[in-house]
Amino acid sequence: MRLCDKDILTHLQEGKISITPEPDYAEISGVTVDIRLGNKFRVFTEHQAPYIDLSGPKAQVQEALNTVMSDEISVGQDKSFYLHPGELALAVTLESVTLPGNIVGWLDGRSSLARLGLMVHVTAHRIDPGWSGNIVLEFFNSGKLPLALKPGMKIGALSFEVMSDFAEKPYNARVDAKYKNQEGAIASRISGDDKTSTQ
């Protein structure tokens, strides 16, 4: 069952869902809570690597990722981050979100930004039950013009769904959780995947 605005507010007031900084009532409407852009970004740097072999040995994958990803970029609150057409960048939400083991969250971009060509998440829009931390955004500019993105701007919305029961393996309890207590624009940790798995 998807939570409506009054249920979202109740869950926040009762501490079942935590969003820090706490959203204003005006930011909760229908079935969503507005979220804002943080000030940390990562981009792909100029590189000579022809490809990244995602099925290769962990050390080799990590070395390739270190070659192509920038260090974290911090943008001042009065400055903008410019995303050019055809570019992918990682960003982070201003808000940190904590969910209990029986609620899954969903991230959606804003229609107004999509109409300018901005994708807020490339594919990863689920926030697992038991999640705690900032949410990394995978920005892609599919439009024709550079987009100036300013920290603090409204960037998307979260909705929440109550599951049939508490998860047996919530995110915060998983040993293999690569982004536990995430802060900042964390780069891909795909090198931490179990390469022996057939799933």
UniProtKB/Swiss-Prot annotation:
Please give the pathway this protein is involved in.
Answer: Pyrimidine metabolism; dUMP biosynthesis; dUMP from dCTP (dUTP route): step 1/2
* Catalysed reactions, as listed in the record: dCTP + H2O + H(+) = dUTP + NH4(+)
Task: Please tell me which top-level EC class this enzyme sits in.
Answer: hydrolase
Q: Give any single GO term for biological process.
A: dUMP biosynthetic process
Record keywords, A-Z: Hydrolase, Nucleotide metabolism, Nucleotide-binding
Keyword Hydrolase, does the record have it? yes
Q: Which residues bind dCTP?
A: 110-115, 128, 136-138, 171, 182
Whether Mitochondrion counts among this entry's keywords is no
- What top-level branch of life does the organism fall under? Bacteria
State a single Gene Ontology molecular function: nucleotide binding
* Residues at the catalytic site: 138 (proton donor/acceptor)
Q: Which PANTHER family match?
A: DCTP DEAMINASE
Q: Function, please?
A: Catalyzes the deamination of dCTP to dUTP.
Q: Which family, according to the similarity comment?
A: Belongs to the dCTP deaminase family.
Oligomer status and interactors: Homotrimer.
* The protein, known as: dCTP deaminase
State the species of origin: Pseudoalteromonas atlantica (strain T6c / ATCC BAA-1087)
Taxonomic lineage from the root: Bacteria, Pseudomonadati, Pseudomonadota, Gammaproteobacteria, Alteromonadales
